[in-house]
């Protein structure tokens, strides 16, 4: 069974539009979790393809300073994975949601219960950056009969054989990491990045999205030329925190309506 997230993003790719997925931190709002659907609605109204929802955690190894601070603000409001899932169960969204979490909160929640409870939300994808592919069977047996795709991350330093191993049989989309390091770093792209992304996109039979360090309209243009779209996190998180909703809506609209 092809997962909903795969079909949804593939349809956007087939329509010759760039896929645009913004990242937000659950609970990082003046209203805490009560503001989550306000932010989701703002992004939906700007035409996003899907929305990545971050789960705050005390040791976020892949997060840059902006997203790490957002997580700390959320944790200070006593936001938990349990509370986030309960909030997401309250209302269906117009576009698929993708949860980005570390493995420890999932383990503490209980893997089977986690997948079961997520199935009662609009979550259609799952990213766990500190879960190596070799240990994916930690959760894949529970996802197999669900409509939730486990999204693999492929970095620049990943060898060709390893890339193919990660891509073959993957669902949802391929998360292509544009820089080595944490989220939010910009401008330090390797010279062979475009070639790497082009090769990845040519090989994969599901959409390839470029993330980590994507923050400008020029980045959106560049990475749509060599992959199927982009994921933007730190810029969105920072601007939302600074109260720049109109600027966020304008930027997201540009990315979401980018014609190939």
Curated annotation (Swiss-Prot):
It holds the Pfam family Trp_syntA. InterPro entries: Aldolase_TIM, RibuloseP-bd_barrel, Trp_synthase_alpha_AS, Trp_synthase_suA. The active site is at residues 52, 63. Keywords: Amino-acid biosynthesis, Aromatic amino acid biosynthesis, Lyase, Tryptophan biosynthesis. Its EC number is 4.2.1.20. It catalyses: (1S,2R)-1-C-(indol-3-yl)glycerol 3-phosphate + L-serine = D-glyceraldehyde 3-phosphate + L-tryptophan + H2O. It comes from the Bacteria. The keyword Nucleotide-binding does not apply. One of its GO terms (cellular component) is cytosol. HAMAP family: Trp_synth_alpha. Belongs to the TrpA family. This is Tryptophan synthase alpha chain. It comes from Streptococcus thermophilus (strain ATCC BAA-250 / LMG 18311). The gene is trpA.
